[in-house]
């Protein structure tokens, strides 16, 4: 009997410590549609490249920075939803929301393994986001490798966005997914992905969004400084300029013009 009492005490103590653990990640939770707000932004992360171009580790840092950025917004007026596809993990749809004075990550859906660059998959994710997080306006952020319309000296036939296990998505398919699944043109698209700020891309997506924000060349490996960028995604006046300046300004402060640069110490600036 004495042994049983000791065991019961230890089990109870373990449960107490587990209950007191500070855990910023919740879920899966039973999703319930939220009341309509001013703006919902869907962040679409494609991290599993399947080769040496892997981006998942960098994107995990981006995700943490997004949580920090959400601390600076009025959650009653906005939603930040993240589709996360990373190496060695199943894809998830996650809501970053404020709860009890801090930002938590609620896992709404966990999917079976799927190609995030498939048109039907992307359309489904967008439709779920719209259904559960209706808003007056929408934004879309895309994180992955991309080639866009590259110069003829490289690959004249390349018109793609994203990179998942050596597969890519045709930009016309990307346009169709956005146009068919969102109920209205987006307020903005932020391409946190190389080479996507081109006339050809803007023309292809001309009926999908009001503003396009990106770089005509390569972007820094660490990507956008989301702690600064996320609050700007939910502004109204000078929206596109606010996002661009938050992105550019971060790297401008780090710029030294000295080589070499690295993802841990990116001092080479960013093209605009």
Residue ranges with predicted function:
Residues 1, 13, 52-56, 267:
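Intrinsically disordered, low-complexity regions
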Residues 131, 155-191, 196-272:
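Terminal, contiguous helix-loop blocks that mediate binding/assembly
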Residues 20, 145, 194-196:
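Functionally engaged cysteine thiol sites
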Residues 3, 10-38:
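Bacterial Sec-dependent N-terminal signal peptides
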Residues 25-141, 146, 150-178:
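Divalent cation-coordinating acidic motifs and surrounding scaffolds
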Residues 19, 135-138, 184-186:
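Short secondary-structure capping/junction motifs at helix and strand boundaries
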Residues 3-6, 265:
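Intrinsic disorder/low-complexity segments enriched in polar/small residues
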Residues 15-20, 59, 119, 191:
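A short linear-motif detector with a strong N-terminal bias
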């Amino acid at each position: 009997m004495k042994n049983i009492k000791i065991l019961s005490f230890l089990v109870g103590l373990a449960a107490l410590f587990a209950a007191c653990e500070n855990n910023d990640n919740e879920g899966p939770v039973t999703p319930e549609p939220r009341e309509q707000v001013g703006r919902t932004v869907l962040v679409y992360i494609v991290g599993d490249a399947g080769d040496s171009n892997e981006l998942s580790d960098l994107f995990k840092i981006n995700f943490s920075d997004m949580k920090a950025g959400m601390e600076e917004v009025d959650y009653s007026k906005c939603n930040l939803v993240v589709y996360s596809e990373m190496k060695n993990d199943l894809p998830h749809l996650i809501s970053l929301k404020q709860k009890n004075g801090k930002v938590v990550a609620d896992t709404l859906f966990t999917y079976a393994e799927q190609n995030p660059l498939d048109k039907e998959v992307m359309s489904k994710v967008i439709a779920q986001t719209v259904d559960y997080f209706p808003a007056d306006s929408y934004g879309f952020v895309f994180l992955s490798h991309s080639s866009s319309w590259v110069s003829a000296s490289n690959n004249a036939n390349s018109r793609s966005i994203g990179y998942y296990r050596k597969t890519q998505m045709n930009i016309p398919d990307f346009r169709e997914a956005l146009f068919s699944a969102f109920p209205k043109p987006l307020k903005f698209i932020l391409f946190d992905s190389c080479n996507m700020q081109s006339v050809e891309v803007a023309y292809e997506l001309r009926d999908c969004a009001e503003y396009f924000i990106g770089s005509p060349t390569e972007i820094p490996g660490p990507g956008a400084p989301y702690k600064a960028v996320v609050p700007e995604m939910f502004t109204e006046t000078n929206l596109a300029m606010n996002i661009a300046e938050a992105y550019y300004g971060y790297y401008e402060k780090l710029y030294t013009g000295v080589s070499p640069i690295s993802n841990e110490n990116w001092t080479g600036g960013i093209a605009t």
